[in-house]
Amino acid sequence: AQMQQSRDWSIESEPGLTVGEKITPISSVGLFTPSGKASYPSVAYQLAVPAVVAGVPKVSLVVPPVPGGSGEIDPAVLVVCRKLGIENVFRVNGPAGIAALGFGTESIDKVVKIVGPGSPAVTIAQVEMQRFGTSTMMLLGPTESLVIADQTADPVRLAADLLIEAEHGTDSSVVLLTTSTGLADATDTELDRQLAALPEVRAAACRASLGPNGGCVLVDDLDTAIAVANDYAAEHLQVAVADADVDRVVDGLVNAGEILIGQDTPFSAANFILGCPASLPTSGFAHVASGITADAFLKRTALARADGTAIRRMASNVIALADHEGFPAHANALHLRAATHVQER
């Protein structure tokens, strides 16, 4: 559906003048799939599918070996690559992999763009590659989620959903934004119960994400909740409010990587199968950026064609601007065409 919207287009904006865009895929891309805290085949396919759909002719994927193993790559990541026809798969650790994609090596071809989430070191490596002409996306830092909930929300499901992004690591951030003290208390109790059932390494990550890195914010009303959420600009945002208020809240939310509506739309489903991008803006970048979709692998080239009548009609405006900015060659190109027209007559 997105590719159907990303097609060449042109219109006659005024008599004799046609403008439009030519949309083409970038020539190559390097995808980074993290493997430091766990293996993420879901990230592999949610990065690779848009690149393949966009028609990028050369897609390379870099993935570190699975943690605690003997240097092997998670077979699930290889299955993703095989199903999508990606043959350039390389086992390289984070920053080294980013550098290899950006500069090229004897075995890894240089690419024009690199995308993918990772550790702070991977993020810094991507920023550094921009200095050498390799395009990257917005910074993809530690994961974060925010839930807007009122007194109608189910604290059991709410606690379960808060723990989804919290278990990623001790640098994650999870926030409950609610108008109800009763819901906050009930959710806190339920969090304790559900945390006890998690493996200790995941429970420790959740406690850090909910405690030092996150928490609960009580607000007077949903309008304040909307304002706070827009200021925070969360990577993942869920709306768990009364049906009568859903549309108003969603309409008011403008800064978020994704907005999941209702308590039957958990973050884990969006992470894996709903079709939402896996790599979303973090650290406030949702104020200005979007998730990685097919558009991230396309470029738009402006097209314009004017006939003689149209360019002569616009000549005086072009000449006036050229004279004001001190560019005589700009103006001369229009004077020449006007003079040629007079001679032809």
PLM-predicted stretches and their roles:
Residues 9-13, 31, 61-63, 88-94, ...:
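General beta-strand structural signal in soluble alpha/beta enzymes
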Residues 1-5:
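Long amphipathic alpha-helix in the N-terminal Rossmann-like dinucleotide-binding domain
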Residues 11-79:
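Conserved small-residue-rich beta-alpha loop and adjacent elements
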